[in-house]
Amino acid sequence: MVLPSSVSQWAALIALLCAGLANAHTVITYPGYRGNNLHTNGTVEQSNGLGQAEVNGSVIFPYGMEWMYPCGGMPTTTNRTKWPVGGGAIAIQPGWFQGHQTALIYINLGLGTIPPNMSHPMVPPFQITGPTNDPYPGTICLPQVPLPANTSVKPGDHATIQVIETAKHGAALYNCVDIEFAEPSEVEEVTRDNCFNSSIISFGEVFTTTSLTSAAAPKSSLMSVLPVYMVALLSWAMM
């Protein structure tokens, strides 16, 4: 499908990347994200190998902010986005940094205004494959991400959605959006403009097997990836 929005928007983002203002990684385009954490500054030597350090009264992130658990170096926001009490859409741009032609995506939920952890998986992890190992445009969207199992919320409750993208070398990028649960009628409408899947990005399943020589995947393995297939089918149906 044709990528929505203008090419000029992507060009502007690439310009920021090249200017050194952003050594970018992952962006949650719907329902939004905590804030601009696409920053890389300072050197590894200045931080003594740490992901964050204070130098001359300023905080540096030599590897980039998004490598920092749990939300890419961004604090909790008071400007929360409304999200449906029964679950809703999540759209991501995964190709903002080199090394992400293949990646695993995790989507978790943390409950409360300032969640003590992000230990509630919303969907099984899934793989994406992009067109190149260099930065690339494109969006993926899951139109109906459910609440974690055995989770009950009501309108007005606070939570944080965490998106993790693990690169092929195992390093993880973190991004979050702080939400307030609301009735669907109070939530920004999901459309083909804010929730779509770019044709240059494909999905892959993640499953376990007891034998690499088996001619067919075990039934339990197939059942374990069924939720991902269902979400992917819903996604492509919206294209």
Curated annotation (Swiss-Prot):
Question: Pfam families, from UniProt?
Answer: BIM1-like_dom
- Among its keywords, does the record have Glycoprotein? yes
Q: Which UniProt keywords apply?
A: Cell membrane, Copper, Disulfide bond, Glycoprotein, GPI-anchor, Lipoprotein, Membrane, Metal-binding, Signal
Q: Which residues form the signal peptide?
A: 1-24
Q: How does it sit in the membrane?
A: Lipid-anchor; GPI-anchor
Q: Transmembrane segments in this chain: where?
A: none
Name the needed cofactors: Cu(2+)
Picking any one GO molecular function of the record gives: metal ion binding
**Which residues carry the GPI-anchor amidated serine lipidation?**
S214
Removed propeptide positions: 215-239
Return the cofactor note field. Answer: Binds 1 copper ion per subunit.
Q: Please give the InterPro entries that the UniProt record associates with this protein.
A: BIM1-like (IPR046936), BIM1-like_dom (IPR046530)
| List of residues binding Cu(2+) | H25
Q: Where on this protein are sugars attached? A: N41, N56, N79, N117, N150, N197
The primary location reported for this protein is membrane
Which locations, inside or outside the cell, does it occupy?
A: Cell membrane
PANTHER family named among the record's database cross-references: COPPER ACQUISITION FACTOR BIM1-LIKE DOMAIN-CONTAINING PROTEIN, HYPHAL ANASTAMOSIS-7 PROTEIN
Task: Spell out the protein name for this chain.
Answer: Lytic polysaccharide monooxygenase-like protein X325
Naturally occurring in which organism (per UniProt): Aspergillus fumigatus (strain ATCC MYA-4609 / CBS 101355 / FGSC A1100 / Af293) (Neosartorya fumigata)
